[in-house]
Amino acid sequence: MSDPLIMDVNPDTPITSDSGFAPEQRAGVLVETLPYIQRFAGQVVVVKVGGHAMDDGDLAARFAEDVVLMHSVGIRPVVVHGGGPQIGALMERLGIQPEFREGLRVTDAETLEVARMVLVGKVNRDIVSGINVHGPLAVGLSGEDAGLIIASARNPELGYVGDVAAINPAIVERLLVESLIPVVSTIGADPTGQPYNINADTVAAALAVALGAERILYLTDVEGLLADTDDPDSRISSLDSAALEDLIADGTVSAGMRSEEHTSELQSRETI
């Protein structure tokens, strides 16, 4: 399989009927998107959405509408989500002081418990519920379910922060066969059953490879990946894994983006 195409999409510009376009503009959008609909009909598309999008009720609702629209035109979406802001908010309410190293949350046993509660019990439920307003379409999954995400420890100094050791996509594939929309939270477990919190970008990339996805869409509330950090007009809208590796090598991808750069490892992910 060739590398899935990676794209940054700003969720503030959805393609639903409530996006603020005039009727003639919506017609133009549909005409422009028809070739893409035809191209990707029947194909798996992994959609990674960050926790910031879920903090805005209107934005979350429009995201759900867009996922349902993809499904309705024959595309097979698989949603992978993060939940960093929600984890941070609950930790603050509980009086737990967060610690970050190299852009990653240091995760002790207490923090891991909070992350599991938020990702599996809150953010995942909210996304599933938002989609299912439009019909019984979405099914929520944790990476622990059916051995979907086999995790390994990234660095003992980070605690229970994990990497993807392997993906067993069988449960996701079964849901896709049933024309359902899998919604995956990024808690995985090692072979002993120990849970780990894994970066959602990393999971999205690994899952895309395991499923043979045609494309990955990254929805972000930031400007995206810039060829020149001082020039907002230099945003890179799409690239493959080889191009991303080049950007890492020449320093365009900076230390502050290290948690995302694992996306460049698409070809090296092991599947079961």
Label each residue range with its predicted role.
Residues I272:
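Substrate-binding/gating loop at the entrance of the active-site cleft, primarily
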Residues M1-S268:
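Nucleotide/pyrophosphate-binding catalytic subdomain
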